[in-house]
Amino acid sequence: MRVEDMKGGYTTGSCATAGMKAGLLALLEHDIVDKVVIENPQGQFIEVPIKSVEIISETEAKATVMKDGGDDPDVTHGNDVETTVTLDDTGKLRFRAGFGVGTVTKPGLAMPPGQPAINPGPRAMMKLVFEEFCTQGQGVTVTVSVPNGKVLAKKTLNHTLGIEGGISIIGTTGIVKPMSEEGFKNSLVPQLKVMKANGCETAVLVPGRIGQDLAEQVLGIHKNQMAETSNFIGFMLEQAVHIGFKRILIIGHIGKLIKLASGSFHTHNRMSDGRMESIVAYAALEGASQAVCEELFNCQITESTFPILEREGLTGVYQRVVDRASMRSERYIANEAEVGIIITTLKGEILAMDKHAKEIGELEHCHIPCIS
């Protein structure tokens, strides 16, 4: 299916804003609606269906909206967002995190510690609703809840970022665009901002669980100093430099990081896969015969090359990989930061590390094991 044929949706921020408007309509105009139109900060209007509205008292109402992310994969898709509005005479708009909505506990995010994890975009949209409905002296407390939020939060980076108790209510435009790779990439960046705000001098980048487990369990690096990159290693390198890191350590499986050595910084197999070609090239530089090169070339996965490299005395390939990956990574970010590389097996055993990784490890007091 083409992207242009796919259905868009709306964010959790739009759900909460729509729920707020439906609740105020019920309280102030005695109007129970099944849809509302809200305005985003860019001046666009979004129609959002309302699942239910309940008047709790003369000053309190709750509206429920089912999150619809369209054709964009999203952990919150199909889940209810409940917004309770409570009228008061403070003249102010206040926000509270209900069940399943997180609270910020670390600096470096869009909202300061102690605040509900309701981002500036949704707050701005709710402020527009507040200004539309509330007269001078009338105040509203908006409590946003997501019944399944604590479970959903485990599938997000919230705990790593320091958001505890549930998911975040997000959205800058209120609209979810289908197949939003940019949106996913941008969701990774706050990890780096939190690390910097908490005084980390080195950014440790891990594509996935293998690198993360090694960093934490073997090297003694705290998980708060690590950022997951998924396949977007190049993007996260650029972001780390932009945020101000001068030292970057990348830890991961050789099958992923060998791609950096050949200059491929989007590491999804569909985008870049020259693993065997690279191993053969480095093996040849180590003196491998044509027959051995052909044997290596016919391997389907990098792990299958290990016994051959060991048998032929070609394990120097691993050092060539990390040295080249470090050089190419530093070149990728115009040498604005020092980049160290550590490559591992699927079991998390270290195969090699370059000199920058050793230097960074010493500065960070990591438990660097001896490699034979």
Annotate each PLM feature.
Residues 1-155, 159-161:
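Generic N-terminal targeting/processing segments that precede catalytic cores or assembly contacts
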Residues 7-13, 161, 167, 172-191, ...:
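A structural signal for small-residue-enriched, beta-sheet-centric alpha/beta enzyme cores
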Residues 88, 123, 322, 326-372:
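Extended hydrophobic packing segments that form well-structured cores
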Residues 99, 162, 230-231, 364-368, ...:
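Proteins with a high burden of low-complexity, intrinsically disordered sequence enriched in S/T/G/P/A and R
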